[in-house]
Amino acid sequence: MALKREIQGVVLQKAGDKTATILVERRVMHPRYHKFVKRFKKYLVHDEKNETNAGDTIVAVECRPLSARKSFRLKAIVAKGVE
């Protein structure tokens, strides 16, 4: 069995029942200037128990496609956001 990809990001919003939108930041080196620049991407994450709120930092793990855009499940909440 292959290892599942894990991503860590900040919850931007609750996109509906059992779904959260997270923002994942990654750092890549610019090909010409050799400086690290930030790249951002949004993912939809399945939150079975509706545990997350906006501002939380979470870890999500890859799973089978649950909808057209949702392929990650909530694994753990790393830090709670400001209430």
Swiss-Prot record:
Domain of life: Bacteria
A Pfam short name: Ribosomal_S17
InterPro entries cross-referenced by the UniProt entry: NA-bd_OB-fold (IPR012340), Ribosomal_uS17 (IPR000266), Ribosomal_uS17_bact/chlr (IPR019984), Ribosomal_uS17_CS (IPR019979)
Single annotated GO MF: rRNA binding
Single GO cellular component term: cytosolic small ribosomal subunit
Subunit structure, as described in the record: Part of the 30S ribosomal subunit.
HAMAP family (alphabetical): Ribosomal_uS17_B
Family assignment from sequence similarity: Belongs to the universal ribosomal protein uS17 family.
PANTHER family: 40S RIBOSOMAL PROTEIN S11 FAMILY MEMBER, SMALL RIBOSOMAL SUBUNIT PROTEIN US17M
Identification of the protein by name: Small ribosomal subunit protein uS17
Gene name, Swiss-Prot/TrEMBL: rpsQ
